[in-house]
Amino acid sequence: TLYPLSPPMKNSAAPLRRFLLLATACCSTAALLAQNPAAPGNPPGGARGPMPLGEVKVLAQFDKNGDKVLDATERAAARESLRANPPARRGGPGRGRGPATPPEPGVSLTTADVKSYGSEGLYDPSTLRTLFLQFEETDWEKEMEEFHKTDIDVPATVVVDGKTYKDVGVHFRGASSYSMVPTGQKRSLHLSFDLKHDKPTLLGFRTLNLLNSHEDASFLRPVLYSRIAQDYLATPRMNFVRVVINGENWGVYSSAEQFSKEFAQDRFGTAKGARWKVPGSPGGRGSLAYLGDDSTPYKAIYEIKSKDDGKSWAKLIQVTKILNDTAPEKLEAALAPVFDIDSALKFLALEITMVNGDGYWTRTSDYSIAEDAKGRLHVVPHDMNET
C-alpha cells in the first residue's frame, strides 16, 4: 500500500483525483494531487494565475524576403526595435540566485577531436554525440537573450557526425532553467532543423531540446525518469549530447525528444490527433477542471500544439466535464471511451514516486496531453528535470 505524504488539502477537488477512487484497493494517492481552483480564474494558493502562453510575434515585421529566417541585417533591426520597445513577456536575462563564479571559456574542440557515430539512433543511450554550432555573430548569446520568448530563432550551421546542416534555428528555452541561470553559464537550447527548409532532419528528428539540468548536478534525474517511465506509458526519450558553440566546449546537455506529431504517430498511432502542452507555472491551473463549454478559459491554460479547431477543444472539454460531473460509480464507464485511465494512473504513480516538483501533482502544470487513434486522450510527462 502506498500511503499519502500529506493530508488532503482543504476544498481540494482535482479532477484526476476523482478517478483514483477506482484504484483505492491498490493505493491511496488521491491526497497528493494538486488543489483545484476554487473557481475558474483563481489558481491554488492565491497565486496570480498562469503566465501568458505563447511567444511575442516579431518575425513577420522584419522578415523582408519572407524566408522565415532573419539575416544579420534583419536581426539587427529587430534587436534595435526590441531594445527600444521591450515587450511584456515572461522572464528576462538570466540573473541566477546569487553571487556566482564568473564563467570561464570552455576548451576548444574541433570535429577531429570527437567520435562520430554511424547507424545508432539519436536517443541511443550508448551514444554521446557532439553537436558543433557555429553562429554568424560573436555575440550570439546576447542576441538570443534579446530574442528570448519571441518567435525569432538565431540561425546557425550545425555539424553532427561529420554532416553539415545549415540554417538551423536556435533559441534559449525554458522558464526557471533560463531565468535562474546567469549570462555566460549553460542555458537550455531549442534547435529547429526545419526552420527554413521543410525536409532536413537530424536522424529523422526535426527538433532537439537540450536541457541544462540547472537544479541537478548529477544530470541524471530527467534521463532516469524517462528510462523508467518508458516501461509504463508514452514518454519522451532522453540521452546525453555534448555541445560546442563557435569552437568552445559548453559541456554535456541532456537531450529530450520533442512532443511532436512524429512522437504522436509513433506512440499513439496517429499524427492527426489533438495535442496540448500545459506550460510550467507556479500558479498553474491545468488540473483538468471543467470550466464550462466555452473554449476561451481553456485556451488561457492549455497551449494547443496541433491544429487549433473546435473539435479538439470539444474533446478536451468533454473529458473535463466527465471527470468533474460524473458520479463515482459511473465514472469509469463514462471516462474509459475518451480517456486512457490506465496510463493516467501510471502517470500519477510515477509523478509521486519520482517526486516531480514541477508537474501535475504539485502545480497542475508542466505536462502534455495527446489524442490517440481511437480518440482517447492520454497524459504525457514533460521535461522531468525537477524530479
Model-based region annotation:
Residues 1-4, 34:
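Short, basic, low-complexity termini and linkers enriched in Ser/Thr/Gly/Pro
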Residues 63-67, 71, 358:
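Acidic carboxylate motifs that coordinate Ca2+ or other divalent cations, activating on Asp/Glu
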Residues 74:
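Ca2+-coordinating acidic residues in Ca2+-binding motifs
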Residues 3, 9-23:
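Bacterial N-terminal signal peptides that target proteins for export
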Residues 10-12, 32-38:
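N-terminal acidic, proline/glycine-rich, low-complexity intrinsically disordered segments
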Residues 35-57, 79-387:
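Phosphate/dinucleotide-binding and metal-coordinating scaffold of catalytic cores
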